[in-house]
Amino acid sequence: MTTDRTYPIFTVRWLAVHGLAVPTVFFLGSISAMQFIQR
């Protein structure tokens, strides 16, 4: 298992997915909270 060239790509891809997923979940959560507070 000496895949040194695939490992950094997987790491960058993992960081990119989480870097986009975390703000998206937080953004959707804040929108749902605003909708709930307004009503």
Curated annotation (Swiss-Prot):
It is found in: Plastid, Chloroplast thylakoid membrane. With its partner (PsbE) binds heme. PSII binds additional chlorophylls, carotenoids and specific lipids. This is Cytochrome b559 subunit beta. GO terms for molecular function: electron transfer activity; heme binding; iron ion binding. InterPro entries: PSII_cyt_b559_bsu, PSII_cyt_b559_CS, PSII_cyt_b559_N. Heterodimer of an alpha subunit and a beta subunit. PSII is composed of 1 copy each of membrane proteins PsbA, PsbB, PsbC, PsbD, PsbE, PsbF, PsbH, PsbI, PsbJ, PsbK, PsbL, PsbM, PsbT, PsbX, PsbY, PsbZ, Psb30/Ycf12, at least 3 peripheral proteins of the oxygen-evolving complex and a large number of cofactors. It forms dimeric complexes. GO terms for biological process: photosynthetic electron transport chain. Its main location: plastid. The keyword Transmembrane applies. It holds the Pfam family Cytochrom_B559. One of its GO terms (cellular component) is photosystem II reaction center. Belongs to the PsbE/PsbF family. Keywords: Chloroplast, Electron transport, Heme, Iron, Membrane, Metal-binding, Photosynthesis, Photosystem II, Plastid, Thylakoid, Transmembrane, Transmembrane helix, Transport. Coiled coil: none annotated. It comes from the Eukaryota. The chain crosses the membrane at residues 14-30. It is a single-pass membrane protein. Its cofactor is heme b. The keyword Plastid applies. This b-type cytochrome is tightly associated with the reaction center of photosystem II (PSII). PSII is a light-driven water:plastoquinone oxidoreductase that uses light energy to abstract electrons from H(2)O, generating O(2) and a proton gradient subsequently used for ATP formation. It consists of a core antenna complex that captures photons, and an electron transfer chain that converts photonic excitation into a charge separation. Heme binds at residue 18. The lineage of its organism: Eukaryota, Viridiplantae, Streptophyta, Embryophyta, Tracheophyta.
